[in-house]
Curated annotation (Swiss-Prot):
One of its GO terms (biological process) is organic phosphonate catabolic process. The keyword Transmembrane helix does not apply. Belongs to the class-V pyridoxal-phosphate-dependent aminotransferase family. PhnW subfamily. It comes from Salmonella typhi. HAMAP family: PhnW_aminotrans_5. SUPFAM superfamilies: PLP-dependent transferases. The keyword Transferase applies. This is 2-aminoethylphosphonate--pyruvate transaminase.
Length: 367
């Protein structure tokens, strides 16, 4: 364990502000109105407002990582007669397929490959051919590659065919402007430690109330029962069914204040975009190539091909960067040797410049 802070160039957990960390120095009682009404309920209202100005939506917080909330939605939203079309082009779409299989949920997996954008015409054809499909689920920002998927076009299909639409916006909500009502999203899933720049400990679901109310008695799990969690928070003014991650919640409340102070989602999106563009330009100047074409990139994380030099080892490159105070991500693409660099969190233009200088220094195989 080290006492030194590194700049995390990852898609979350990410580098947080000092004030977000300091918010966790306070201890809260989970039965206290100051906490449940004063903090939890305020967070729920703010999340819903960030997602849409339209009526009929609500927010539910759930202990655990983002995957817990994805599993809660799949396990609660789909009844025994339902079937979900899962659009997959990375590890997180594949994880939804695995979850559906383990829970015995009928599903059709449309796997378009890790470096390909989902083909909307192909999705249209699947929906047209199989009227038993009741739900569509997909990832927005697929951090396996840095791909930004077309949730608007798929949402239009979901609306046209009358399907319930589930979007894993884990690494995009709070960092990319969106209106979930306009996108026809029924369940949006995200996490505390992503673009809102909190710390790990809980995830959240912003859902259409009418859809959520229909989930009663459907859950395949006790602790991941999304309907029961929602009703507990509604009926008890922010109370969690099981132990609330109080310190994480306080940090998140502070992170929401800092998002507003920055200028909201639009301003944060602009910063993330500039970070990503500067990173890509600088890396290309150093001789690195991106895995994806520019038009496919999200402003969240970028995958770069590993150097072909026989001396190159990611572990050594990583170590040399870490010695200089920067932490990057290994690759997760099955067919390509690459590594990834995120640019969200408390990361600014000067940090990207410093990172590029550190990368130049760490390129031992060029010496």
């Amino acid at each position: 364990m080290t006492s030194r802070n590194y700049l995390l160039l990852t898609p979350g957990p990410l580098t947080t502000s000092r004030t977000v960390k300091e918010a966790m120095l306070f201890d809260s009682c989970t039965w206290d109105d100051d906490y449940n009404i004063g903090v939890v309920e305020q967070i729920r209202q703010q999340l819903t407002a960030l997602a849409t100005a339209s009526e009929g939506y609500t927010s539910v917080l759930l202990q655990g990582s983002g995957s817990y909330a994805v599993e809660a939605v799949l396990g609660s939203a789909l009844g025994p007669q339902d079937k979900v079309l899962i659009v997959s082009n990375g590890a997180y779409g594949a994880r939804m397929v695995e979850m559906a299989g383990l829970m015995g949920i009928a599903h059709h997996a449309y796997d378009c490959g890790e470096v390909a954008r989902p083909n909307v015409q192909a999705i249209d054809a699947i929906l047209n051919a199989d009227p038993t499909i009741s739900h569509i689920a997909m990832v927005h920002s697929e951090t396996t590659t840095g791909m930004l998927n077309p949730i608007d076009e798929v949402g239009a299909l979901a609306h046209r065919y009358g399907k319930t639409y589930i979007v894993d916006a884990m690494s995009s909500f709070g960092g990319i402007p969106m209106d979930i009502a306009a996108l026809h999203i029924d369940y949006l899933i995200s996490s505390a430690n992503k673009c809102i720049q909190g710390v790990p400990g809980f995830a959240f679901v912003i859902a259409r109330e009418q859809k959520l109310a229909a989930c009663k008695g459907r859950s395949r799990s006790l602790s991941l029962d999304l309907y029961a969690q929602w009703r507990c928070m509604e009926d008890n003014h922010g109370k969690w069914r099981f132990t609330s991650p109080t310190h994480t919640v306080l940090a998140f409340a502070q992170a929401l204040k800092e998002l507003a102070k920055e200028g909201g989602v639009a301003a944060r999106h602009q910063r993330y975009q500039q970070n990503q563009r500067s990173l890509v330009a600088g890396m290309r100047a150093l001789g690195f190539n991106t895995l994806l074409d520019d038009e496919l990139h999200s402003p969240i994380i970028t995958a770069f091909y590993s150097p072909e030099d026989p001396q190159y080892r990611f572990s050594e490159f990583y170590r040399r960067l870490k010695e200089q105070g920067f932490v990057i991500y290994p690759g997760k693409v099955s067919q390509s040797d690459c590594f990834r660099i995120g640019n969200i969190g408390e990361v600014y233009a000067a940090d990207i410049t410093a990172l590029l200088t550190a990368i130049r220094t760490a390129m031992y195989w060029t010496k």
